[in-house]
Amino acid sequence: MGQSSLDHGVQGPVAGTGDFGPLKEATATGFISCAQAPRRARKRVEGTASSNVFSMFDQSQIQEFKEAFTIMDQNRDGFIDKEDLRDTFAALGRINVKNEELEAMVKEAPGPINFTVFLTMFGEKLKGTDPEETILHAFKVFDTEGKGFVKADFIKEKLMTQADRFSEEEVKQMFAAFPPDVCGNLDYRNLCYVITHGEEKD
């Protein structure tokens, strides 16, 4: 599998249009996909000794990462830089991200962040990642105020329209096991714990 076959043909929201609706939807897909990818790929990542990052993931996972990369590459130059990150956070509703935060993110990479570097960074992070931490991090993206919960209706919409789509029945089963509170909030910390440990916290 060559890199060139992965660098073309992925469509994303048009940069510079000011229409953040599609970008929000697509970015959410990327984060949800990232939460799912460790579940499916972690054993392969931990067990591989290959230096070829593309061997860590199957084709569908690479495509998901490519879609996330394309969304974040706001200026479509093939690299993710500080301004791309700032625009992505703005699309998610975080408009006051500090320069220092953005610089720290960019500095995690060994050089300019093209798709291969982006994929390598995910591969490295997945090697020692705690699945509970990974899932929590994905939920925290939507919990911008750090309250520990997200709106159940929002999660339902994402589960049924993005990535590996849930059916109505699957969503009902999930909410039967993890019912939202009277305000319609879902305690995602407890949900993540049960997913990864198989039982509720005491």
From Swiss-Prot:
Q: Which GO terms describe its cellular component?
A: mitochondrion
| UniProt xrefs under SMART domains | EFh
The terms under GO molecular function for this entry are:
calcium ion binding
The gene for this chain is Myl10
Induction of synthesis: Up-regulated by interleukin-7.
List positions binding Ca(2+).
73, 75, 77, 84
Name the source organism: Mus musculus
Q: Where is this region: Disordered?
A: 1-21
Question: What is the recorded name of this protein?
Answer: Myosin regulatory light chain 10
